[in-house]
Amino acid sequence: MSASYQTIEHDVPQSYRDKILKWNGWGYSDSQFAINKDGHVTFTGDKYEISGKVMPHFRPWFENYLGIDLGFVSPAQKLSDVIIDAPVENEDIIEFLQENKISFSNEARIRLMRGHGHTVHDMINLREGKIPRLPDIVVWPKSEHEIVKIIEGAMSHNCAIIPIGGGTSVTNALDTPETEKRAVISMDMALLDKILWIDRENLTCRAQAGIVGQSLERQLNKKGFTCGHEPDSIEFSTLGGWVSTRASGMKKNKYGNIEDLVVHLNFVCPKGIIQKQCQVPRMSSGPDIHQIILGSEGTLGVVSEVTIKIFPIPEVKRFGSFVFPNFESGVNFFREVAIQRCQPASLRLMDNDQFVMGQALKVASDSWWADLKSSVSKMYITSWKGFKVDEICAATCVYEGNREEVDQHEERLNKLAEQFHGVVGGAENGQYGYRLTFAIAYLRDLGMNHGVLGESFETSVPWDKVLSLCRNVKELMKREAKAQGVTHPVLANCRVTQVYDAGACVYFYFGFNARGLKNGLEVYDRIETAARDEIIACGGSISHHHGVGKIRKQWMLTTNGAVGIALLKAIKSELDPANIFASANLIDIIGSPHCKL
């Protein structure tokens, strides 16, 4: 790495972000899908259940489905060859940080690691060594008091601030605006990572906002509790990040989304600290100020502490699965589950293409009995039940509770599935589906290594529009890809991941072989934009839980209306009149060079 400036720093912490995470890909440095010496796909490292396992069926599926050759490699640029521009100089803020003994650094790699999230643009730019505008200084507050001091310093010395938690954003929320002329401070919350107290009587927990999800859950488990919030990013995302993006976890059916779990929070903004004066389950005291902070995406200030609900660890956790003859049958089953309000902790439905992809990711078995059992199961489904291989879809679920509750819940869902021509697939298949949850995020890196551009995105949609939205968006992505010159088959599948009374959350996975395209990222952008337009046209939302960031701002006016946008701008103007928190997420500030609204 080359940087033509002097590094200045004070009391820099040893951060897991810098030590064990990839700088240009998802997750841990030692974990990735790779090709072994026998030409099969395997998973490296030791952090996941599929680590060290071979997936003999995945390579042929991947190559045939996307028209690629895994022997062709699109290498990423080495970190040592990446050139980082010098930061915007601001000696006053450096002196301020030194005087107040606040940990900081302007070292190139540290700035780089905090200057991006995980969109396909972020990753391709890093792989190609195209480094955009980065934050100029990274600070690590060790207390709420230091957060206040840093904001005061930014206001006094003409700086901007972009907070960062786990860095898992997929909305360009962490990208520094190219138009920002001030020195930009990245406020890394990593040192604010402690549980402050656990209240066993009221079943609440107070924690600092920088605590990583898996650490929070691990510490609670040792005390006999769970927070119940389990997003797919739980290994790396933080409590403060969950609040800032209005996050959702896969077990929301039992425990709720983050807005249901928050009891109290502290929020530091340029005008001071926002906090309610009591920690109660509900208040009727005017509009709920928590709802202003939830989903604010670092545009108004930074979350410092949060009180959340906690729950005793359930006595029983059991997996389940179902196979349906087609996607429509599965969706109708989900709708009936919602009507009868008998959702298990988690319930997911994969369409046929995603079901086939999941089968391709099955690891090689050492047991001939397991292989035989799998063959018999497939014969039962296809030959005896008459399910068509190119229409089958599957659902996986998690039951949690005491043994009696789980037994009754499982029996009820099994009977309900039969009414919609479903076949019980058993706990083992359900458990395998959830085992893949955290490892599957690494698939995109494998694709990029071989010329594939891909992304996932989500929406929420009313029940009466789920089927049409899924069908129309998938068809549009394939049609638009062909129109944009993509000559190979396109990956376009979906799953229903959350069940609500009035609708569902739908996740789309999209990817294509970009070899031979001169402008692969531009093609990708045009396809994704068309897909999001189609989602809106089909009655879906701008996002269910990923948030808006910068990449979805163009739909904010359509989503919230002119008066709604005016209200958001008024809140911004009141809490942050100097635009200190200048991430440019959600809305554009009137008078800024990039203002469109």
Curated annotation (Swiss-Prot):
E.C. no: 2.5.1.26
UniProt function note: Catalyzes the exchange of an acyl for a long-chain alkyl group and the formation of the ether bond in the biosynthesis of ether phospholipids.
Region named Important for enzyme activity: 544-546
Residues where FAD binds: 163-169, 232-238, 245-248, 297-303
Keyword Protease applies: no
GO MF term (any one): alkylglycerone-phosphate synthase activity
Known cofactor(s): FAD
Top-level enzyme category: transferase
Quaternary organization: Homodimer.
UniProt-annotated catalytic positions: Y507 (proton donor/acceptor)
GO biological process, one term: lipid biosynthetic process
Annotated keywords: FAD, Flavoprotein, Lipid biosynthesis, Lipid metabolism, Peroxisome, Transferase
Pfam families the record matches: FAD-oxidase_C (PF02913), FAD_binding_4 (PF01565)
Start and end residues of each FAD-binding PCMH-type domain: 131-313
This protein's name: Alkyldihydroxyacetonephosphate synthase
Site feature location: Important for enzyme activity: R348
Functional pathway: Glycerolipid metabolism; ether lipid biosynthesis
Gene3D superfamilies: 3.30.160.650, 3.30.300.330, 3.30.465.10, 3.30.70.3450, Uridine Diphospho-n-acetylenolpyruvylglucosamine Reductase, domain 2, Vanillyl-alcohol Oxidase, Chain A, domain 4
Lineage, top ranks: Eukaryota, Metazoa, Ecdysozoa, Nematoda, Chromadorea
